[in-house]
Amino acid sequence: MRNIKLTIEYDGKRYSGWQRLGDDDKTIQGKIEKVLHQMTNEEIEIIGSGRTDAGTHARGQVANFKTNTEIELSEMIDFMNRYLPRDIVIKRIEEMPERFHARYNAVGKKYSYYVWNNVIPSAFERNHSFYFPQELDMDKLNAACEN
């Protein structure tokens, strides 16, 4: 059995988070598992390195799944990116040792928060940042980051 690692990027604004809940098709996990089933005709459960909440985005979410398919990795990534919604992208695919587990082998997580600090709002940044048109108190922000 093969153990496949994915590095995933997604814009989570249309989704209920990472974790599939029942037959909920509004999750990142659910969308990926549906495409994996189309590709392999296997019932596959994908394991994420962590979970994201509703509306949260990811630039490098790692996940893995086990499969018996003999499809080449290059064909897998092409298929997945063709059939996944455009706001979910497989950035990298690798075959891993049997013991690899995305959650248990994770070494860290990085969270980034973006503030659009300008008098004029941005049409492009509005879904990916917090708009704050007033002057920021950088001393208070830095102190908050230390706590």
Language-model features: locations:
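Structured-RNA-binding interfaces characteristic of tRNA pseudouridine synthases
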Residues: 1-147
